[in-house]
A protein has these predicted regions:
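Conserved helicase motor
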Residues: 35-39
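A short, flexible N-terminal coil/short beta segment enriched in small residues
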Residues: 1-12
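C-terminal accessory helical subdomains adjacent to catalytic cores in phosphodiester-
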Residues: 1-2, 16-32, 44-60, 65-165
Length: 165
């Protein structure tokens, strides 16, 4: 069984998912996120850290697929396993399978809208963009509730299938 050495997330909502998955996997690693971490910075940091990881360690990143030309990077560099009707993907980095991405398509808000029927309009989406990390995670737990936990369990089970713990 491979262990996870680092977990990175692109935004607060992605961080909430990352923390819940890490807990489910029994990981004792802190999820790293700063307000400056967009998708490209998360990927760049993960690639840099990969060079210094032990052979049995993995990095998990929680990112958005995005729209338009920026999707190409994901398409070219990750082997994708689709979940939730192609709205969520678990991607294994083609150049180094120790980097695994959980990818929301096209973004976390779009994924939640399609799967839960929430966060579809701009006012609701703002709830995921303001306040502290704790407030955003509490918002997700309260509004999405049981569905949030099911999504976390599905992601966790998929990661276990590819032997990540």
């Amino acid at each position: 069984m491979s262990r996870v050495g680092l977990v990175l997330a692109e935004c607060y909502a992605n961080t909430c998912f990352a923390e819940a998955v890490a807990r489910n996997l029994g990981l004792e690693v802190k999820v790293h996120h700063t307000y400056k971490m967009g998708r490209e910075k998360v990927i760049k940091k993960a690639e840099k850290v990969l060079r210094n990881l032990r052979g049995d360690e993995h990095i998990l990143i929680f990112i958005d697929y995005e729209i338009g030309p920026s999707r190409k990077y994901i398409d070219v560099n990750f082997e994708l396993q689709a979940m939730y009707g192609d709205k969520l993907h678990v991607g294994v980095f083609k150049r180094d399978e120790r980097l695994i991405a959980i990818i929301f398509d096209p973004n976390i808000e779009g994924f939640l809208c399609k799967v839960t029927g929430r966060y579809c309009d701009e006012d609701e989406r703002k709830m995921l963009k303001r306040g502290s990390l704790e407030e955003v995670c509490r918002e997700l737990q309260e509004v999405v509730g049981v569905e949030f936990n099911k999504i976390i369990n599905d992601i966790t089970n998929t990661l276990r299938e590819i032997h990540v713990e």
